[in-house]
A protein has these predicted regions:
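Loop/turn elements at helix/coil->beta-strand transitions in domains of secreted/extracellular proteins
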Residues: 5-8, 32-36, 45-48, 106-109, ...
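Detector for C-terminal structural segments
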Residues: 11, 18-19, 42-76, 116, ...
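Periplasmic solute-binding protein
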Residues: 14-27
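Short helix-loop capping/hinge motifs at secondary-structure junctions, enriched
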Residues: 26-35, 205
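Immediate post-signal peptide segment of exported/extracytoplasmic ligand-binding proteins
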Residues: 33, 92-111
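Short, well-ordered beta-strand elements
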Residues: 107-117, 140
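Short, well-structured beta-strand/strand-turn elements
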Residues: 133-147
Length: 267
């Protein structure tokens, strides 16, 4: 890249893909929201972003919608959610307190199942295990062959597992549908009529500002109050191309803008 200099243009964008942690709500101790919340509080997402973005296709610290898009929560507001504050020492002290309160002993061991795809599952999985170790948890990673992994999630053959999604457009109806209680993709099997109602209301309203408020309420309940799932870091697209290529603009989704009908070459 350096050798080519101005002959190459690099476009970057947050990606409408991410890995998050699903926990079975019908298996102890993950049926206790204090434990789930502690697992999120343990994560230093900001240090993780700095380190992992150098070796993996993840970068932005985000909530339930792609950072920088219309329905995404601004950073200052996001930082109020459990696990998103910058004081990691305080966060981890709270995590340890919650685990103790929930009766989880120091050194508690569990298996984290991960999808057998190197990027970015492997580095993100290693990072998660290291973060949880720092609140006194002993986590073993079990890597499952990629072709078998979706079936494992559908069967519920896990206590804690890496989950994932990629959207074809940044839209709350699509990105949040899996968190409705009756969704086939609700692999943690949480039952939350509050989220169900909020999801239905945000889908029906035609008032953009009202919809943003409803999406924020879903986010707070999903990631903070109930900690049904744990978001890691947003994937990050980096697309280099020859500078003589014009008319192509990166999007948050790799499914879009590939027809190339507006692309032209200056030489």
């Amino acid at each position: 890249m350096t050798a080519l200099g101005p002959k190459v243009t690099v476009q970057e964008s947050p990606w409408d893909c991410l890995n998050f942690v699903s926990m079975r709500h019908d298996k102890k101790p993950f049926d206790d929201k204090r434990v789930r919340r502690a697992l999120s509080l343990a994560l230093d997402r900001y240090q993780g972003s700095t380190a992992l973005s150098k070796i993996a296709i993840v970068k932005e610290v985000g909530g339930i919608l792609v950072p920088g898009t219309p329905y995404a929560t601004p950073p200052a507001e996001l930082e109020k959610l459990a696990g998103y504050g910058h004081d990691i020492k305080k966060n981890r002290e709270e995590a340890k307190r919650l685990l103790k309160e929930a009766g989880v002993p120091d050194g508690f061991a569990f298996t984290f199942k991960n999808r057998g795809i190197p990027m970015p599952y492997e580095p993100v999985g290693v990072w998660l295990i290291d973060q949880w170790r720092q609140i006194g948890l002993n986590v073993r990673q079990e890597v499952i062959e990629a072709s078998q992994y979706h079936g494992l999630l559908k069967r519920g053959d896990f206590d804690v597992a890496m989950d994932f999604q990629c959207g074809f457009i940044v839209e709350p109806d699509l990105d949040l549908a899996r968190f409705v209680s009756t969704s086939d993709a609700n692999y943690g099997k949480h039952k939350d009529t509050v989220i169900d109602d909020l999801y239905s209301r945000q889908a029906r309203t035609t008032d953009i500002e009202e919809r943003k408020k409803l999406v924020r309420q879903i986010e707070k309940r999903l990631l903070d109050e109930e900690a049904h799932v744990i978001y890691t870091l947003q994937w990050h697209r980096i697309i280099p191309h020859l500078s003589k290529v014009h008319g192509w603009t990166i999007t948050p989704c790799h499914y879009l803008n590939n027809q190339l009908d507006a692309v032209w070459l200056s030489e």
